[in-house]
Amino acid sequence: MLTIYIDMDDVLCDYSSKIKEHKHKNPDNPFPQSVPGFFRSLEPMDGALAAEEQLRKKTNVEVYILTAPSTKNPLSYTEKRLWVEDKFGYEMTHNLIICSHKGLLKGNILIDDHASA
């Protein structure tokens, strides 16, 4: 069995664009991700949802969403979980892992926007 971990921010959802948008609208807030509702409102990256769905259809693959929480927004745990349910359905929430230390998990592949994750 192949285990694949997929990051959320800037892999499944467009985190950077939302940060830029918030900074443009609210330049006095240095941490846009601290705003309640920020993570829930993220748009999917083009093609990301379809690609994740194709991976889940493979019989020899286990797919998990592995994402770090925001230290600036304690609601990020709930908002990220709700985002996954909205985009992939309730069952996929069982494959959501929210962890600050991604290197602690054992798997075959990590799809992440940060090389050092």
Task: Kindly give the residue locations of the regions a language model identified.
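Active-site neighborhood of HAD-like aspartate-dependent phosphohydrolases
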Residues: 1-42
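A general structural motif
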Residues: 1-3, 60, 93, 106-107
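Short catalytic/ligand-binding loop motif for oxyanion handling, primarily in non-cytosolic enzymes
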Residues: 13-16, 63, 72-76, 104-106, ...
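Short, flexible loop segments at the rims of nucleotide/cofactor-binding pockets, characterized by
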Residues: 39-43, 87-90
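Substrate-recognition element of Asp-dependent hydrolases with the DxDx(T/V) motif
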Residues: 42-43, 48-79, 84
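Structural recognition of alpha->loop->beta junctions
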Residues: 82-97
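Conserved Lys-Pro-Asp/Glu-containing loop-to-beta segment of HAD-superfamily phosphomonoesterases
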Residues: 95-117
